């Protein structure tokens, strides 16, 4: 049952994190009449602009997080970022608060160690070889054992922060320092992984709903500086590899538990599939589903967490997204060229309405459909290139 917002019978959902992905979740919640409360560390974040009301707190502050949940008494608490005091969510779930998909899933996936050990050691899924390191001495030993090239990541970071590929062991100290600077906790434990010479990597959006597990068509993507630049759907792959990918995703999602959409990241090398990471929430590469599917990843997430069925997921055809990226410092961001960016058929834009920029920031995305994937990517890139960010 869903009541009208601002009434006694309202269904209240609290978003912990109000970026561009949270904004789309908020919009989908609004479409189904849910009262939305946005929470983030800064004012006027994208999802706050479409929420019924919002609060600014440090979500890593356990007392502040508990206080805001107790104040608002939401029926659903929906973490949309990793930088949250997850132990508080675990405690509050035990007290009866509904954490999406589960507090355990949120805590496990907040750091790479929890989810990697679950996937490799508990579920026995294929992954790259790895070591976790607390000191630079352990780090150097791990590099010697795994060999180069290898990948280094802070166990707690996002959007590529602190990640690097070591191709020369002489550069290990620089990689260690970069990882320490990029961690959300300001340094600490890192993972050293063997480099998988993959043919391609995918995001398999996997939905756990009241009527079972559902899969979106696989999404291919290109990364640069640890963050995505373009994504496309569907990624071409054999039936055998798709079946292996879906089997891995099902095991991970079922082990994490709860209802919702999960972004399962996988590497594909020949006929082999390797687990990489998982997010228990919509994934940035899944922004392409805003144009590629009848139900976007955000609509699917909301249906699932509200306990609603998903009869089918229709994919419209070859589609792509291309990031609108800017670099600079400003609290007065404007955009030119929007008309030119939308001249081609089957193109759309999403401008995230982020309030400011200080450095490099993703400010929007261009979306396109075409007769094949290459054409869709080209069209999305062309559309994105026409949007000029003015400071």
Curated annotation (Swiss-Prot):
N(1)-(5-phospho-beta-D-ribosyl)glycinamide binds at residues 20-21, 80, 284, 354, 361-362. InterPro entries: ATP-grasp, ATP-grasp_carboxylate-amine, ATP_grasp_subdomain_1, PreATP-grasp_dom_sf, PurT, PurT/PurK_preATP-grasp, PurT_C, Rudment_hybrid_motif. It catalyses: N(1)-(5-phospho-beta-D-ribosyl)glycinamide + formate + ATP = N(2)-formyl-N(1)-(5-phospho-beta-D-ribosyl)glycinamide + ADP + phosphate + H(+). Keywords: ATP-binding, Ligase, Magnesium, Metal-binding, Nucleotide-binding, Purine biosynthesis. Its EC number is 6.3.1.21. GO terms for cellular component: cytosol. Pathway: Purine metabolism; IMP biosynthesis via de novo pathway; N(2)-formyl-N(1)-(5-phospho-D-ribosyl)glycinamide from N(1)-(5-phospho-D-ribosyl)glycinamide (formate route): step 1/1. GO terms for molecular function: ATP binding; magnesium ion binding; phosphoribosylglycinamide formyltransferase 2 activity; phosphoribosylglycinamide formyltransferase activity. This is Formate-dependent phosphoribosylglycinamide formyltransferase. The gene is purT.
């Amino acid at each position: 049952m869903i009541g009208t917002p601002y009434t006694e019978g309202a269904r209240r959902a609290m978003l912990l994190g109000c970026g561009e992905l949270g904004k789309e979740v908020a919009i989908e919640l609004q479409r189904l009449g849910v009262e939305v409360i946005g929470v983030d560390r800064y004012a006027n974040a994208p999802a706050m602009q479409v929420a019924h009301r919002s609060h600014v707190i440090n979500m890593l502050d356990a007392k502040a997080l508990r206080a805001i949940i107790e104040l608002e008494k939401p029926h659903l608490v929906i973490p949309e970022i990793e930088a949250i005091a997850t132990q508080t969510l675990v405690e509050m779930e035990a007290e009866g608060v509904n954490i999406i998909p589960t507090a355990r899933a949120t805590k496990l996936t907040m750091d790479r160690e929890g989810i990697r050990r679950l996937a490799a050691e508990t579920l026995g899924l294929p992954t790259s070889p790895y070591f976790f390191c607390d000191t630079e001495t352990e780090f150097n030993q791990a590099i010697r054992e795994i060999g180069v090239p290898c990948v280094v990541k802070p166990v707690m970071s996002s959007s590529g922060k602190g990640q690097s590929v070591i191709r020369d062991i002489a550069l290990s100290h620089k990689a260690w320092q970069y990882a320490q600077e990029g961690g959300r906790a300001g340094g600490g434990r890192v993972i050293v992984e063997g480099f998988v010479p993959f043919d391609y990597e995918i995001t398999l959006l996997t939905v756990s709903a009241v009527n079972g597990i559902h899969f979106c068509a696989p999404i291919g993507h290109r990364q640069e500086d640890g963050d995505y630049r373009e994504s496309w759907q569907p990624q071409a792959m054999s039936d055998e590899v798709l079946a292996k990918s879906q089997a891995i995703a099902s095991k991970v999602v079922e082990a994490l538990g709860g209802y919702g959409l999960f972004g399962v990241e996988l590497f594909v090398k020949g006929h082999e599939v390797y687990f990489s990471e998982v997010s228990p929430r919509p994934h940035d590469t899944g922004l392409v589903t805003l144009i590629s599917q009848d139900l976007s990843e955000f609509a699917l997430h909301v249906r699932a967490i509200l306990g609603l069925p998903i009869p089918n997921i229709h994919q419209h055809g070859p589609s792509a997204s291309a990031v609108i990226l800017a670099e600079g410092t400003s609290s007065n961001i404007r955009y030119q060229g929007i008309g030119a960016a939308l001249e081609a058929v089957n193109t759309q834009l999403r401008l995230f309405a982020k309030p400011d920029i200080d450095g490099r920031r993703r400010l929007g995305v261009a979306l396109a459909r075409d007769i094949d994937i290459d054409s869709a990517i080209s069209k999305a890139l062309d559309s994105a290139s026409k949007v000029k960010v003015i400071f």
